[in-house]
């Protein structure tokens, strides 16, 4: 449960928000690392296929975490007063909104790309994900290119987000980073 401390103390987010934030961060970075790693491997090799399979399975996990995160944020998560005002608040709100939008788009593109390949895909080998929409195989390259572009955009925005957190912590010393590191 989140609390708002008085005076110079910081606001602390609820545990669920913190868990969803860091789980999302680790999944996004991990998915990106898997994709970038397999791009250096020859097509059709067992290692490349394993990395792609892991990317798909963790991508499905990411989709579930993202949906749960949005539900949590809308229904249960504690809203705190903004840590900044003026242009910092506008920038923070804009980057957060854009990250959410891009993550939703990336998830949709991931499904579309797999469906365009016309091959079944599984969640850690436990079950196959059904094809819900028939996608023309010819659109695969276009969708794959968008998936790659959105991935890089998310990584760049996430890096800016992390740098902003460090700026708040070391320059402004306003407790913003500590709000996402601990819950009381």
Language model features by range: what are they?
Residues 39-49:
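Membrane-interface helix termini and inter-helical loops of multi-pass transporters
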Residues 95-115:
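Hydrophobic alpha-helical membrane-insertion segments
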Residues 68-88:
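Membrane-helix interface/capping segments
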Residues 136-157:
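Hydrophobic alpha-helical transmembrane segments
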Residues 51-65, 150, 155:
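Alpha-helical transmembrane segments
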Residues 111-132:
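Juxtamembrane non-transmembrane "cap" segments at the membrane-aqueous interface
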């Amino acid at each position: 449960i989140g609390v708002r401390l008085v005076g110079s103390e910081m606001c602390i987010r609820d545990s669920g928000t913190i868990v969803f934030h860091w789980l999302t961060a680790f999944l996004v970075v991990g998915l990106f690392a898997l994709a970038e790693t397999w791009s250096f491997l020859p097509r059709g090799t067992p290692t490349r296929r394993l990395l792609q399979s892991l990317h798909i399975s963790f991508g499905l996990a990411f989709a579930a975490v993202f949906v749960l995160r949005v539900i949590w944020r809308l229904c249960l998560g504690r809203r705190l007063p903004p840590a900044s005002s003026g242009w910092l608040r506008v920038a923070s709100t804009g980057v957060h909104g854009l990250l959410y939008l891009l993550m939703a788009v990336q998830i949709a593109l991931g499904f579309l790309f797999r469906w365009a390949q016309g091959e079944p895909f599984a969640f850690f080998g436990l079950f196959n994900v059904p094809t819900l929409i028939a996608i023309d195989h010819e659109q695969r390259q276009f969708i794959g290119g968008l998936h790659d572009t959105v991935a890089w955009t998310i990584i760049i925005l996430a890096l800016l987000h992390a740098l902003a957190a460090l700026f708040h912590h070391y320059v402004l010393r306003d407790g913003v980073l500590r709000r996402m590191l601990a819950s009381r």
